[in-house]
């Protein structure tokens, strides 16, 4: 079964309390439609819109929008890693990745390529591209490209020093 080797990750950590609303959208409650019309109700143009296109396409009832965070959550026991939710997300924040050892993982919960000051204003959880994680990683597993940190799962040893050093 594919599920044993793959998992779904939501690469947006901008929960409702971390991303203040800057405007209101009254159009169709569809991520695909909304993303073609505007950037979202928060200051982050890269974050989850929260309308649940990913939920609608899941044939296994494995993904839902958490009403408290406004973000998609995946039930790993139901998910078959078919990738339907990945294709449905116009913001490309849902990724299909190889499972890490013991289902542990360290990853960046942000896809914003904006500069640090813009990210900090839009979302308290966003990667500001400061590079502190790169400096503390003894395994050269982290790089910063386009103002965003990337963690190489082949090099990462799950020591979590980068997590402790991250200011966001």
Language-model-detected regions and their locations in the chain:
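Small-residue-enriched alpha-helical segments and adjacent helix-cap loops
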Residues: 9-18
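Short cysteine/histidine-rich metal-coordination sites, predominantly Zn2+-binding motifs
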Residues: 29-33, 74-76, 102-108, 144-146, ...
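Glycine-rich active-site/cofactor-binding loop and its immediate structural neighborhood
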Residues: 20-59, 63
């Amino acid at each position: 079964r594919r599920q044993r080797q793959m998992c779904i990750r939501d690469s947006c950590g901008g929960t409702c309390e971390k991303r203040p609303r800057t405007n209101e959208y009254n159009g169709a409650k569809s991520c695909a439609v909304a993303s073609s019309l505007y950037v979202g109700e928060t200051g982050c143009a890269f974050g989850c819109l929260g309308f649940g296109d990913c939920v609608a396409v899941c044939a296994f009832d494995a993904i839902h929008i958490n009403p408290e965070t406004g973000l998609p959550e995946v039930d790993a026991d139901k998910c078959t890693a078919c990738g339907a939710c990945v294709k449905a997300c116009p913001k490309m924040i849902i990724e299909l990745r190889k499972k890490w050892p013991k289902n542990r993982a360290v990853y960046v919960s942000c896809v914003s390529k904006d500069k640090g000051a813009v990210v900090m204003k839009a979302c308290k959880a966003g990667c500001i591209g400061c590079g502190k994680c790169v400096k503390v990683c003894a395994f050269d597993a982290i790089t910063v490209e386009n103002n965003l940190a990337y963690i190489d799962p082949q090099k990462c040893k799950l020591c979590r020093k980068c997590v402790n050093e991250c200011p966001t």
